[in-house]
């Protein structure tokens, strides 16, 4: 994934309906790095022989690896710098396999001006456009 600079948006400049996204191809190296970082070595993620016997038919990425891409969009693009993650609801709807290209998208649903809060829909789709993760985030924007 390319290095990007966090976008600097003022709270007042963020509007309901604004969207941002980030796409990434998920690799074996990503999955292994996530396993090493978190200590989650569940064999469905790291052992191909084991994973072949599961309903997935092979290794899949950790759900939270996929969800982590949402954090990247929120922190780097919308709402960007000076935003604090307060809450995240997630529903994992399908697997991410090695080689899949996933796109994390956020969309501003609501602003709560008196608390400088932003509520966003958070979703991830795969290269076929299938929704694989859906949720809602609440952030505080300075």
Model-derived segments and their meaning:
Residues 33, 50, 86, 115-116, ...:
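Sparse recognition of residues in long alpha-helices and their boundaries
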Residues 52-61, 67-105:
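Hydrophobic beta-strand-centered segment that forms part of the acyl-chain substrate-binding groove
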Residues 36-40, 75-79, 127:
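Short, intrinsically disordered, mixed-charge
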Residues 2-61:
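Catalytic strand-loop segment that frames the active site of acyl-thioester-processing enzymes
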Residues 21-25, 91, 107, 138-140:
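Generic structural detector for well-ordered beta-strands
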Residues 1-2, 6-16, 96-142:
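HotDog/MaoC-like acyl-thioester-processing domains
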């Amino acid at each position: 994934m390319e290095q990007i600079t966090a976008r600097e948006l003022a709270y007042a400049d963020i509007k309901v309906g604004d969207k941002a996204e980030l796409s990434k191809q998920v690799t074996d190296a990503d999955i292994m790095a996530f396993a090493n970082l978190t200590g989650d070595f569940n064999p469905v993620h790291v052992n191909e022989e084991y994973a072949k016997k599961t309903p997935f038919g092979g290794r899949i990425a950790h759900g939270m690896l996929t969800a982590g891409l949402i954090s990247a969009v929120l922190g780097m693009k919308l709402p960007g710098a000076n935003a604090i993650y307060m809450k995240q609801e997630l529903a994992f709807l399908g697997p991410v396999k090695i080689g899949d290209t996933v796109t994390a998208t956020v969309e501003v649903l609501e602003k709560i001006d008196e608390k400088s809060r932003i509520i966003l829909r958070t979703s991830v789709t795969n290269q076929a456009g299938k929704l694989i993760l859906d949720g809602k985030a609440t952030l505080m924007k300075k």
